[in-house]
From Swiss-Prot:
Active site: H569 (proton acceptor)
Cofactor annotation: FAD
Record's cofactor remark: Binds 1 FAD per subunit.
EC class of the enzyme, as a word: oxidoreductase
Protein's job: Thioredoxin system is a major player in glutathione metabolism, due to the demonstrated absence of a glutathione reductase. Functionally interacts with the Sod/Cat reactive oxidation species (ROS) defense system and thereby has a role in preadult development and life span. Lack of a glutathione reductase suggests antioxidant defense in Drosophila, and probably in related insects, differs fundamentally from that in other organisms.
Additional remark text: The active site is a redox-active disulfide bond.
Taxonomic path: Eukaryota, Metazoa, Ecdysozoa, Arthropoda, Hexapoda
Organism: Drosophila melanogaster
Protein known as: Thioredoxin reductase 1, mitochondrial
Amino acid sequence: MNLCNSRFSVTFVRQCSTILTSPSAGIIQNRGSLTTKVPHWISSSLSCAHHTFQRTMNLTGQRGSRDSTGATGGNAPAGSGAGAPPPFQHPHCDRAAMYAQPVRKMSTKGGSYDYDLIVIGGGSAGLACAKEAVLNGARVACLDFVKPTPTLGTKWGVGGTCVNVGCIPKKLMHQASLLGEAVHEAAAYGWNVDEKIKPDWHKLVQSVQNHIKSVNWVTRVDLRDKKVEYINGLGSFVDSHTLLAKLKSGERTITAQTFVIAVGGRPRYPDIPGAVEYGITSDDLFSLDREPGKTLVVGAGYIGLECAGFLKGLGYEPTVMVRSIVLRGFDQQMAELVAASMEERGIPFLRKTVPLSVEKQDDGKLLVKYKNVETGEEAEDVYDTVLWAIGRKGLVDDLNLPNAGVTVQKDKIPVDSQEATNVANIYAVGDIIYGKPELTPVAVLAGRLLARRLYGGSTQRMDYKDVATTVFTPLEYACVGLSEEDAVKQFGADEIEVFHGYYKPTEFFIPQKSVRYCYLKAVAERHGDQRVYGLHYIGPVAGEVIQGFAAALKSGLTINTLINTVGIHPTTAEEFTRLAITKRSGLDPTPASCCS
């Protein structure tokens, strides 16, 4: 049992010091004459821990050990002179590795700071980092605050975007729309279904919000149980070790050895008349206290398309306004197939179009004027709801980052491979960092790994490559690895082979659902082992299909391994094992039947 290197080593050595120095302990402090009142492995470990404790309390000047002004110390360990005997070495203790770790001043023993770590942001990244840091012996506070939305004043509890206004409510409403579709398909499968069945928006919103509030509550309890101090306040830096927290009851100044910025982002609003006064964003949609009705969704990223998709499935009339391209950053062949599948379902797309203004009419409806950016032609239409989905902005403005000396790039924070900013004791994780995937699982893992490096002696870094993701449109799109365009750009068109095919889900046949856009492809190297660089899939339960293949891709999946894997029949996932036609061949990738 390697007690000196365990995650609780700091606490352990403190307790051991008390035992070793207590007159009633019955343990002689002379290393060579430990009594037999305790088993040998305990006595030797206690002696080792006592030595570690003395060194930890005395040693300063290493990276991570600073005085209250932030200056590094310069004192050598006691007893480190030329004539000092070598320290006791436990046979199972990697002392060299342990000594190489940063030495922190523990605030619980009169150190210079209120906390070892303050995490700014109570979302996925911040919570994961805070809880993991506590498990590794740090004293942690988590600062969290939500500004009300400008149009409706929407607020929410702890948990960040994903829990409150992102992944969770989005997936629930997507599921509600799929259930509505399934109900209408049920008649083809022999079910007697009332033709007048329709969703109740208010009941759906209430159910979604009840679930969110339960998650908020569980999260608060979890933070309390794990001894993370939760501070509901807006934080701004005074200097690199001091934060001013604005609370409901006033202000509070708090200090920490280390800060992790995990504030995430919020939706952008266009700079046009009426945008803020009358438009809403995804921050408002999932708690909207009225039916959305005829809705203009401005923006064709994944948020805009997902919202338009479930609104259509719930019986409303969405229109998508696209300034340039659909699903920027994704494989564009797949993106256009997704858009085409939505148009087939009756969702209009206004291409190459931007909004000019939003006006509220006497009847409460919204008059939107817009323009085609290619022809200059202007037009207008009336909607019940205007939903802005034009991108997100990092929440850096309220942090007063210049006071701490932290660099900002395009409202995001640039970091190195260890999530460190340009300031030695300040880190950033999650959606706030520049140039990394803005996905909840990425944020969670990055936050945990950062805490383990800071307080657990780990060296593992976050791997941001080949991260799988899913767009929850009516016909879902999931992918992992490189898009076809990026693979060509990185390796050259002559070095890339694309295996592709359309397929026919068995469950689509009886209700006679369209299979026109059920498509998948594997982007691979053309020669050699034909390693797979990217996998792309459009169809039902896309996220469930791609997850396992994501692990295979990260493990070095090749085309030969893929096509020689025996598939599970009949499933849509097995279609990846049947990819045999390349784009270069020019052959028709459309199957004759579900089993061909």
